[in-house]
Curated annotation (Swiss-Prot):
SUPFAM superfamilies from the UniProt entry: Nucleic acid-binding proteins
Keyword Zinc: yes
Domain of life of the native organism: Archaea
Gene Ontology MF terms: metal ion binding
Residues binding Zn(2+): 23, 26, 37, 40
Protein name from the UniProt record: DUF35 domain-containing scaffold protein
Binding partners and assembly: Interacts with acetoacetyl-CoA thiolase and HMG-CoA synthase (HMGCS) that catalyzes the first and second step in the mevalonate pathway, respectively.
Role this protein plays: Functions as a scaffold to connect the acetoacetyl-CoA thiolase and HMG-CoA synthase (HMGCS) dimers in the channeling thiolase/HMGCS complex, which allows for efficient coupling of the endergonic thiolase reaction with the exergonic HMGCS reaction.
Pfam families: OB_ChsH2_C, zf-ChsH2
Stored InterPro entries: ChsH2_C, ChsH2_Znr, NA-bd_OB-fold, Thioester_dehydratase-like
UniProt record similarity statement: Belongs to the scaffold protein DUF35 family.
Record flagged with keyword Iron: no
Gene source species: Methanothermobacter thermautotrophicus (strain ATCC 29096 / DSM 1053 / JCM 10044 / NBRC 100330 / Delta H)
Lineage: Archaea, Methanobacteriati, Methanobacteriota, Methanomada group, Methanobacteria
Gene3D superfamilies cross-referenced by the UniProt entry: 6.10.30.10
Length: 133
């Protein structure tokens, strides 16, 4: 149980930091991080990039019939968010009426509970997005 929690927090920083990578040769940005640029291949040099957490909804879906794990929060929105830096991430959109979401809406990252694990109720946190206020 604790091993999974430690792995989530310590070994997968993009789960809570919204970090990716940027190719210094062609300028492409990636989420999650990559070690080789698919455009430049070995010629490209990648550096870590911390995203601003701001973006727009590129596409979305309202989930009305979720799995048992998420039935208490239905209906909810899952979207592809295009970040200001150009990378796209898939995330839940929170703090909104699902019927009010539209493609192109501005959103910003927030840090929220993602799930509870097992009988001990160990909570995992991560990024989600909410409409920009």
């Amino acid at each position: 149980m604790m091993t999974e929690t430690v792995r989530t927090w310590r070994h997968i920083p993009q789960r809570y930091n919204l970090t990716g990578s940027k190719c210094l040769q062609c300028g492409n940005v990636f989420f999650p991080s990559r070690i080789i640029c698919p455009e430049c291949r070995r010629k490209g040099k990648l550096e870590e990039l911390k995203f601003s957490g701001k973006g727009r909804i590129h596409s979305y879906s309202v989930i009305n019939t979720p799995t048992d794990e998420f039935k208490d929060i239905a209906p909810y929105v899952v979207a592809i968010v295009e970040l200001e830096e150009g990378a796209r991430v898939t995330s839940q959109i929170v703090d909104c009426d699902p019927d009010s979401i539209e493609i192109g809406d501005e959103v910003e990252m927030v840090f929220r509970k993602v799930r509870e694990e097992g009988e001990d109720g160990v909570i995992s946190y991560g990024f989600k997005f909410k409409p920009k206020t």
